[in-house]
Amino acid sequence: MPRALWTAWVWAVISLSTEGASDQASSLSCDPTGVCDGHSRSLNSIPSGLTAGVKSLDLSNNEITHVGNRDLQSCVNLKTLRLGANEIHTVEEDSFFHLRSLEYLDLSYNRLSNLSSSWFRSLYVLKFLNLLGNLYRTLGETSLFSHLSNLRTLKVGNSNSFTEIHEKDFTGLTFLEELEISARNLQIYAPKSLKSIQNISHLILHLKQPVLLLDILVDIVSSLDYLELRDTNLHTFHFSEASISEMNTSVKKLIFRNVQFTDESFVEVVKLFNYVSGISEVEFDDCTHDGIGDFRALALERTRYLGNVETLTIRKLHIPQFFLFQDLSSIYSLTGKVKRVTIENSKVFLVPCLLSQHLKSLEYLDLSENLMSEETLKNSACEHAWPFLQTLVLRQNRLKSLEKTGELLLTLKNLTNLDISKNNFLSMPETCQWPGKMKQLNLSSTRIHSLTHCLPQTLEILDVSSNNLDSFSLILPQLKELYISRNKLKTLPDASFLPVLSVMRISRNIINTFSKEQLDSFQQLKTLEAGGNNFICSCDFLSFMQGQQALARVLADWPDDYWCDSPSHVRGQRVRDARLTLSECHRTAVVSAVCCALFLLLLLTGVLCHRLHGLWYMKMMWAWLQAKRKPRKAPRRDICYDAFVSYSERDSYWVENLMVRELEHFDPPFKLCLHKRDFIPGKWIIDNIIDSIEKSHKTIFVLSENFVKSEWCKYELDFSHFRLFDENNDAAILILLEPIDKKAIPQRFCKLRKVMNTKTYLEWPMDETQQEGFWLNLRAAVRS
């Protein structure tokens, strides 16, 4: 029994293991190109079953703890491997040995406490390696990257435990496009550790304290293009002139990101600019200045310029003692060579007039997302301020008057490009004054409702997108580019207003359609963006849009942003794919064809009616409907005649001379109704027939060949059908005046043939000796 339990337990474990492997394999999703995605799947190991067809494998953000020698041995064509954000603490020596095609390897944010050069010894073509966020203190006992001669991007270090950089660490690396070192707690930096790298395009350095900053800078200053310093507290930074005074520097750009300064340390940084003479661009991003702007030490140091810095960018500058900040007069003299300044989202409400006047080389000024108003702009753009300024960006400030803003900028004689978007102007005056060289104006998102002659006639580029405009009727003879998206325009602007327009972006309006003629009227138009409108996909519009191959070269957003809004059956379809029916696109032709068909049908119906007596049937139907409305039987007091006689005019002699004599002159006499004698003059014949039949006790039909051919006899017989035969009574008396071939009776007299087959009729005898008996039988039938 214990043996059986043991066997069952073993099989259960094997079954669970198999299911686990199967579940892990199924957790990968791979496309036909060999890209497999397994990130965020709670995997605790690398899935089995990987093949040579896998070229990209993403296993990031899982719970993998170990990478074994055989886990990836089949992935010989793998180029990208992402293992970041796992729990990996062990990587076996030959784990990546078979990945000779690997170009991208991410092992960041795991739990690796030791790094081994054997991992990378066969990765000759590796270009990207990320080892950030692990637990190692150093980069290993031997040179870790000596085999990675093609490496271009390297990220190493962590924010806590990485404390040492040694001279051998980067041996073998000669050129890197990007090197990121996270060493917030760096304690040891061996001189010349980075000097072995002959060229570094971009170095990102995370340092908490600046103690070793100059030592690092000395090693890289001659091989680095772009230095980015992050998360550093420069309160204690002190620049030593002797450190780099004799170095041939190549650094061109310097970025401080999330760095803290004091007044004193800022002075030291400015001194650095003067000695690292290659720096032409400096950026401060999300930095904090713990001071009050007391830079008098710069004057004592006789610092006259910011080195060769021409571009200065400041974003999200935090000044805790903002209301104690001084007037910056001590740095005015340093700004003479600066050509481009960006101060964004830093609560700037004023640029002092003296500072503006000292910015004699300034060509570009961006003061976006600040607190500038017309009152402070008046002081900033004072006389002789920014004499060479060409571009001014005042986006998202507190400007409210377009007219006043234009007047205040008249002092800027060389201004050509003005961005005052995202200010609340609301309206536009009829006239304005602007600098005489204005060519570009950005008024997007300013909530204006209409455009007036306030706009300068010299404009070549105008952006009025994201407003409330419903029309564009301005003449701008030099305008080349118009950006008017996200408004309420219903049609394209008139081309005669914009004779040299080459670019127009008019998407997200309420335009229903445009035509070939409209586009052709813009003779120099090269780019049109008109997607996102509510297009009515008419036949003409679809024919134009789908039939012009050259149109695709003009429409920048074709075909993905062009959708039909109507008709309803094509709503939601792309204009390129919409199809209308023949009747919708050729309405005139279809209507003409239908009319012709109806005419032919009517003509055919008329012919058939004539040949098949259709008109007669319609008349009878109408008479029948009229007769149906009358009472089924007339009251006895309304009976005026003993019999109504239906006969052909050609048989009138027999009726009027023989029948009348034998019936009306008999004693007692019978009263007959004859149409020639008793019909009421002026009354419709059909009404006379109906009334006479209704007021007669019997109806006598004098049947003959003439009767069958008589039109009125047909009417009388039909009405007798409706009133007499349909009621199944004996009010009808048939007299066969002469023999009739039943086959000769027309089809419309079907009831006559039926009656002659089912009812007894009186036949007029040609023998005079039998005629007396005929009259006796007729009188008896009328009297019954």
Swiss-Prot record:
The chain crosses the membrane at residues 588-608. Residues 21-587 are extracellular. It is a single-pass type I membrane protein. GO terms for biological process: cellular response to diacyl bacterial lipopeptide; cellular response to triacyl bacterial lipopeptide; inflammatory response; innate immune response; toll-like receptor signaling pathway. A motif (ATG16L1-binding motif) lies at residues 761-778. GO terms for molecular function: NAD+ nucleosidase activity, cyclic ADP-ribose generating; transmembrane signaling receptor activity; triacyl lipopeptide binding. Residues 525-579 form the LRRCT domain. There is a cross-link at residue 754 (Glycyl lysine isopeptide (Lys-Gly) (interchain with G-Cter in ubiquitin)). InterPro entries: Cys-rich_flank_reg_C, Leu-rich_rpt, Leu-rich_rpt_typical-subtyp, LRR_dom_sf, TIR_dom, Toll-like_receptor, Toll_tir_struct_dom_sf. Disulfide bonds join 30-36, 353-382, 432-454. Residues 639-782 form the TIR domain. Residues 1-20 form the signal peptide. It is found in: Membrane; Cytoplasmic vesicle, Phagosome membrane; Membrane raft. The record marks 349 as: Interaction with bacterial lipopeptide. Glycans are attached at residues 114, 199, 248, 414, 442. Keywords: Cytoplasmic vesicle, Disulfide bond, Glycoprotein, Immunity, Inflammatory response, Innate immunity, Isopeptide bond, Leucine-rich repeat, Membrane, NAD, Receptor, Repeat, Signal, Transmembrane, Transmembrane helix, Ubl conjugation. Ubiquitinated at Lys-754 by PPP1R11, leading to its degradation. Deubiquitinated by USP2. Glycosylation of Asn-442 is critical for secretion of the N-terminal ectodomain of TLR2. LRR repeats lie at residues 54-77, 78-101, 102-125, 126-150, 151-175, 176-199, 200-223, 224-250, 251-278, 279-308, 309-337, 338-361, 362-388, 389-414, 415-437, 438-457, 458-478, 479-500, 501-524. One of its GO terms (cellular component) is receptor complex. Ester-bound lipid substrates are bound through a crevice formed between the LRR 11 and LRR 12. The ATG16L1-binding motif mediates interaction with ATG16L1. Belongs to the Toll-like receptor family. Interacts with LY96, TLR1 and TLR6 (via extracellular domain). TLR2 seems to exist in heterodimers with either TLR1 or TLR6 before stimulation by the ligand. The heterodimers form bigger oligomers in response to their corresponding ligands as well as further heterotypic associations with other receptors such as CD14 and/or CD36. Binds MYD88 (via TIR domain). Interacts with TICAM1. Interacts with CNPY3. Interacts with ATG16L1. Interacts with PPP1R11. Interacts with TICAM2. Interacts with TIRAP. This is Toll-like receptor 2. It comes from Giraffa camelopardalis (Giraffe).
